Amino acid sequence: MNSFVMYGTAILSIAIIGYMLVKKMDIKITLFFIGVILMYIAIVAGNTIAIKDFKSSGAGLLDPLLAIVSTFKSTLAGAGFIILLLGGYAAYMSEIGANEITVSVLSKPIKNIRSPYVLVPVVFLLGNLLSLVIPSASNLAIILLATLYPVLRKAGMSPLTAGAVIATTATIMPTPLGSDNVAIANELAKYPEFAGLTVSQYVFGYHAIVSIPTLLIMAIAHYFWQKFEGRNEAIISANEVEKTEGSYCSNSVLYRSAYVLLPILPIILLVIAYFIKLLGYSKVDLTVEIAVVISFIIAVLCDSIKRHSLKEAVKETEKFFKGMGNAMPIVALLVAATVYVVGLKSIGLISALQNVMTGMNGNGLGFVLPLILVVLSAVIVLLSGSGTALFFAMVPLIPTLASAAGISAIAVAVPMGLAGNLLRAVSPVSAVIIIVSGSIKADPIEVVKRTSIPMIAGVVFMFILSMILFL
């Protein structure tokens, strides 16, 4: 294929997708459409569709559509199914009130802390812990605004300080239940150097050793930045804010003790299984799918005991399957991104990039690729407010580009994935910033001013640590 046509087509497609991301438009259909167009261009130019072991339908006109079907099948058999299960389990936890109880129980200890600025790092770390239960940044912010915000105000914390801390709670807590972690782990496992890699191994072996120190650094940065910014703020009583109590929070101690563990039970099972295997006591691999299914069965049993009715408990399980359906857009985005990448591979762009990047590591420039992708993530996130859209779109490309640059795919995957989640709280158009600023009656830019330094400090520290560990 002519180089001018190849690069021109690729640049135009990237520009269209970038425009749609910035405009916060749904890019799934665009990725599908552009991917198919690129495959047709490749076929006209005499290239083949770049899918391993792809068998043509016998009609070139149908092959790009067959590629979509093939990609859907392979994704649903792997990462897609895990994401659907996680969506179902999260929805079921909300339905039976377990999420509400977990938030209530974990929030209680902070009521005894009276210093507003000591509360800043405590609430930040607590909020990130709660993101294991409620991974959506906007949903977690809504819950914390209703439950923790009044407590923080009564402790003397200003609205902007409290809002900034709440806006930054769902960031980079390492969890095998994160759909972004599931997607990249399954993609890496397709390559020989990461053969057999599970989500737990990726999260605890790579993600956590960067994300946990980064969270601690951000907690410290939060303390000093909020204290610096709040030096001229008046302490105002929060009598106007009413605390809302969850409808499930007045039940027995036994009930609360059991339900508080249910939302994080899959994580507990995966952590236990991971360390048992690490210590050599077992060779059993507990997958995310099995952990979720076991947890779901236990949750149904607990709910039937609480309701004194198996019939009523089983009726509520319908929410699990509806939750799976609600998670389908994430799977569709992953498939759409893969189809687009197949299109880029088919026109020869990926091979051309590999040739350009070969030798980069030998010249001591191995950090350039991760840096470019982190900067690109920053631009897209700041303009669009989406922390993971670009990452999902890039997942199929990460191993290939890293190999071409002569560096580990982990050195690309970890910083790019973490950067998007961190910088979400710095975008004035992100859902979480809009929700928080509206709730505390402040301008989004004022909230972003309070979140920016801790998040940027986290990105810089995270990138440097990733390069030291993985490059």
Where do the language-model regions lie?
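Long, contiguous bundles of hydrophobic transmembrane helices that form the permeation core
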Residues: S3-I14, G18, L31-L38, A42, ...
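Membrane-interfacial loop-to-helix junctions in multi-pass transporters
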Residues: S3-Y7, K73-G80, K108-V122, A155-T161, ...
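Short helix-coil transition sites and intra-membrane helix breaks within transmembrane domains
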Residues: D26, L76-G80, A90-I101, S131-I143, ...
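Core transmembrane alpha-helical segments of multi-pass membrane transporters/permeases
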Residues: D53-E100, D285-S351
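Re-entrant/interfacial helical elements at transmembrane boundaries that shape
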Residues: T102-S104, S138-V151, S179-K190, T388-L401, ...
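Alpha-helical transmembrane segments of multi-pass membrane proteins
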Residues: P116-L130, A155-T175, L197-Y206, G366-I380, ...
